[in-house]
Amino acid sequence: TVITSISLDHMEYLGGTVTQIAGEKAGILKKNMPVVYDDTDAAASAVIRNRAAELSCPAYPISPEVYTDLRRGHGGMSLMIKEKSQRLFIPFEAEYQAVNACIAYQAARLLAVDGETAAAGIRNAVWHGRMEEIQDGVYLDGAHNEGGIRAFVGAAAEVAARRREESGKDGRIFLLFAAVSDKNYESMLETLMRKLKPDRLVLTHLYTSRALSMEAMEKAAHRVADGCEVQSIPDVKTAYQTLVQEKRPEDTCFCVGSLYLIGELEKKISRTGFDSTARMV
């Protein structure tokens, strides 16, 4: 059994607190079967750990404590798993993927996959829409709830800082944002503005019945803008093209807020590889 990070999402089905959601997730544990889980949230971990004990499940908690020597660079990062003395290369720039990779590695080893084969699988992994660079300095990220946005801003700030250092110029940060109406979009926007401090925010509208109205999004964005330029462009394709065309080489552009947004962009972007340029179709 594998359980990744738990945050407040799908609360209408799973419950209104992290512990309630963890209890629902722990429902997949099976008696005497091992469980590998994200151990970074104490409240969630306690629920999973207790359920594992009740069912006599061998438990493998994974947190940043299990690895050392984290090295970051353009296109990914590497780390050393302490207990296994195994170095992993992770082809994603967001640091939260380090724990995810270690979870995957531990699960593979429990399935009798040898260490080198497991490491090769992680090294060759592809994950569209998670801090995915689709052309130079343009990233898609599917963060769509408060926990996801908190993880996103840390990773995005590091990416933007690295690009500024590499270019030797004070590059700007652009955001393309959209959300669905049943998420805490006000908190998401506040975190983005306060932590990432973008120079420009473009709001767009999703083609789904769950989409947040432009009016509600604009009101929330202007409330927390704090000097950031805010623009509304309802058409996703036009909004994307506007930001990318105005982006200078040293600037960084992030598209975030909803998996619906990432899905719409994925349909409209043609790419031939990770480091290729993308064009709208």
What residues fall within each predicted segment?
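Nucleotide phosphate-binding/pyrophosphate-handling subdomain across enzymes
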Residues: 2, 6-7, 20, 84-200
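Acidic, Mg2+-coordinating active-site environments of NTP-dependent enzymes
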Residues: 3-88, 101-116
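Short coil/turn segments at beta-strand junctions that form active-site/ligand-binding loops
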Residues: 33, 169-173, 228, 249-252
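Beta-strand->loop->alpha-helix junctions that form or flank phosphate-binding loops
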Residues: 38-39, 51-72, 91-94, 117-125, ...
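C-terminal helical cap/extension that packs against the catalytic core
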Residues: 41-56, 60, 189-252
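Short, flexible loop segments at boundaries between secondary-structure elements
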Residues: 206-210, 275-281
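Active-site-proximal loop/hinge segments that shape catalytic or ion-binding/gating pockets
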Residues: 258
